[in-house]
Design a protein with these regions (language model features):
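Mid-domain Rossmann-like dinucleotide-binding core that forms the NAD(H)/NADP(H) cofactor-binding site
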Residues: 1-69
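Hydrophobic Val/Ile/Leu positions in short beta-strands of Rossmann-like dinucleotide-binding domains
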Residues: 19-21, 97, 120
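Glycine-rich phosphate-binding loop and adjacent beta-alpha segment
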Residues: 38-39, 56, 61, 99-164
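Short, well-ordered coil/turn residues at beta-beta hairpins
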Residues: 66, 96-98
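Short loop/turn segments at beta->alpha junctions
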Residues: 70, 100, 175-178
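Short amphipathic alpha-helix with an adjacent loop that forms part of the alpha/beta core around
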Residues: 70-90
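C-terminal hydrophobic helical "lid"/dimerization subdomain
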Residues: 83, 106-107, 150-187
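Short SAM/SAH-binding signature in class I
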Residues: 91-96, 116
């Protein structure tokens, strides 16, 4: 629920926990939110080099392209990044899966470990297999969320106003005469 997400974000910020996330269209915003809330390390994961560069531009400490590092290699790269940053690679990570794709979900699930939290943000229709007893063994949790509640809007607005979240690079102004074309492009 949104309340669970808010609790997770608050706990992560308070503990300055590291964050991992698999990207998508929301990726650069999630990186900014994580950094804005004080995450010690943010790792962005995406198959698109432009999105990875954008995440680095907006605060990701490291990025991983699953096309370059697949399966166990990706996990090893993730561990190396954590070691370089001086944080545990398998304890307490907050993972945000934003793509909604089966590969993104599988990557996120593969990184979930001890006292970690996976927050599913991206919507997808593919089924994914996961051994639920791992949640018990890892004392981990998986949360699904659609967004935050209106009472959190002031905090988000504050991060936008003080520059922790940059909106300008994501906004494009077009004349009203193009509204039909823009709508068609967006849908």
């Amino acid at each position: 629920s949104a309340a669970d997400l808010e609790a997770t974000l608050a706990a992560a910020a308070a503990a300055r926990r590291p964050w991992a996330r698999t990207a998508g269209g929301v990726g650069s915003f999630m990186v900014q939110v994580a950094k804005g809330m004080g995450a010690k390390v943010v790792v962005g994961i995406d198959v698109n080099a432009e999105k990875l560069a954008r995440m680095r531009d907006f605060g990701a400490d490291a990025t991983i392209n699953p096309r370059e590092f697949a399966g166990k290699e990706l996990k090893e790269r993730f561990k190396a990044i954590a070691k370089e940053a001086g944080v545990s690679a398998n304890t307490g990570w907050k993972i945000f899966e934003c793509t909604g794709t089966k590969p993104g979900q599988e990557t996120a699930l593969s990184l979930l470990s001890f006292v970690g939290t996976l927050v599913v943000v991206g919507y997808g229709t593919d089924e994914t297999s996961y051994m639920l007893s791992k949640l018990m063994a890892f004392d981990a949790e998986i949360i699904g969320t659609w967004g935050c509640t209106p009472d959190k809007y002031p905090a988000v607005l504050e991060m936008c106003l003080d520059g922790r979240i940059q909106l300008g690079p994501f906004v494009e102004t077009r004349p009203m005469s193009q509204i039909q074309h823009v709508f068609e492009q967006a849908h």
